[in-house]
Amino acid sequence: MRKCFFMSHNPEEKQSNLDSNHKNESSSNKRIKFKTWQFILLLLGVVIITAGITVAATIGISHKISGLTKDERQEIKKIEYAYKTLNNDYYKKQNAGKLSEAAIDGMVKELKDPYSEYMTKDETKSFNEDVSGDFVGIGAEMQKKDKQIMITSPMKDSPAEKAGIQPKDVVTKVDGKSVVGKPLDQVVKLVRGKEGTTVKLTIKRGSQEKEIKIKRGKIHVKSVEYKKKDNIGVFTINKFQDNTAGELKSAIIKAHKDGVRSIVLDLRNNPGGLLDEAVKMANIFIDKDQTVVKLEKGDDTESIKTSNDASNEAKDMKVSILVNEGSASASEVFTGAMRDHKKAKVYGSKTFGKGIVQTTREFKDGSLLKYTQMKWLTPDGHNIHGKGIQPDTKIASPQYQSISVIPTDKSYSVGDNTKYVKSIKIGLDALGYNVNNDSKQFDTQLESAIKKFQSEHELSVNGKFDKKTNEKFTQLLVEKANKEDKVLDELINKLK
């Protein structure tokens, strides 16, 4: 089985069990990304963060794979000989499957391409589940807060909701095992399981503790959220998965009935997804037989076009697209097509800039090889790879939303001079501690602000930015970002 993928996220950003062999970004380059869904683990078996973009396997240029030359056959024989030798003659017994996986993984790593990777059976399963948006679990959003695992909310009609799970329930045990102080991803692994099996959660609600048995089931995570703000329809599109276009079309019909005639398509921090859904989504606004994206490999070009007329409801609407540096791949395909066809104005900040395509080959054992195969261009032929898409009108995010993630394995104190100190200053200033953030120097003013911060949040008051202070600092910044959206507010004011 073969598919084509645009990998749709920062290739150097560590992802939890999705795209798990992407190179880990050094802590010096990480950025805190603020968007509610990025800080909540859904108990659906995986962490929802990344996706791939699938291109139909019928594209002609994806089939042109030549046979092996004589020299190439010799190289294959060498690999086969090495495999047989190590498997049969090494002084310790070897796992044949792991040897072959290591060989494939080694070939992929030699490409030095962060978008190419070899996935094991389990990694492939998780990846495919993420692309489809269907998962097996209990359907409850949860987060870690002050060492406690707290339910943010059960999803509507989910097993968790039907079992009586409520927002702010604190999970203390899973199947009788304490989860107090455990990392969130470990708790997710305990809660996940096979469809139809039961998990027992011990939850604390107020001063009472109770056990709740929940039967795991299949859950679909919606990728489109709609709200009406000042008579403007705001559609947050988290990623492009199965039926994203259908969800958006239904929401647009509802908005049209509500009298909405101006809409914002919020693609900020949308890492991408299924190309087919990006094309279908563009088709809501763009008429039949219009190019949405061009795929190129060498001298071959394939244009992917719309297949239907645009939605009548969408034709009545003024469309604005909101993007940022986290808008990648399928988000850029859609944004580029909408702008080239003059169907929307683009606001926000420059997009990620992912203009190459990956294809996949699945092995009989369920593992998968993904590698870069071609590039894509916008309908007008623009190559955005490494450049991104510049907005028509720039709306900058608050400074604290793009600070570096501060390593927790180091404590910062008076005399330190590093960009992390500047991040601390920017963050504390955003939290209301009136810190001058013009320099990277850890000065006495910052020390005083940290002491005040520590005192107000029941931390050890030492004036040092230590691990516990760092964790509380990050938690509060995330909460602040999730409560306010100055970029969207500014755009709404422009559109009124």
Curated annotation (Swiss-Prot):
Residue numbers annotated as active site: 329 (charge relay system), 340 (charge relay system), 354 (charge relay system)
Protease among keywords: yes
Alphabetical list of CDD domains matching this protein: cpPDZ_CPP-like, Peptidase_S41_CPP
Predominant localisation class: membrane
Membrane topology note: Single-pass membrane protein
Residues of the PDZ domain: 124-206
Localization of this protein: Cell membrane
Pfam family, one: CtpB_N-like
EC number: 3.4.21.-
Region Disordered, residue ranges: 1-26
Alphabetic keyword roster: Cell membrane, Hydrolase, Membrane, Protease, Serine protease, Transmembrane, Transmembrane helix
GO biological process, one term: signal transduction
TM helices/strands, residue ranges: 39-59
Gene3D superfamilies per the UniProt record, alphabetical: 2-enoyl-CoA Hydratase, Chain A, domain 1, 2.30.42.10, 3.30.750.44, PGBD-like superfamily/PGBD
GO molecular function: endopeptidase activity; serine-type peptidase activity
GO cellular component, one term: plasma membrane
Basic and acidic residues bias: start-end ranges: 10-25
Catalytic EC class: hydrolase
Keyword Transmembrane helix assigned: yes
Similarity remark: Belongs to the peptidase S41A family.
Name of the protein in its database record: Probable CtpA-like serine protease
Species for this entry: Staphylococcus haemolyticus (strain JCSC1435)
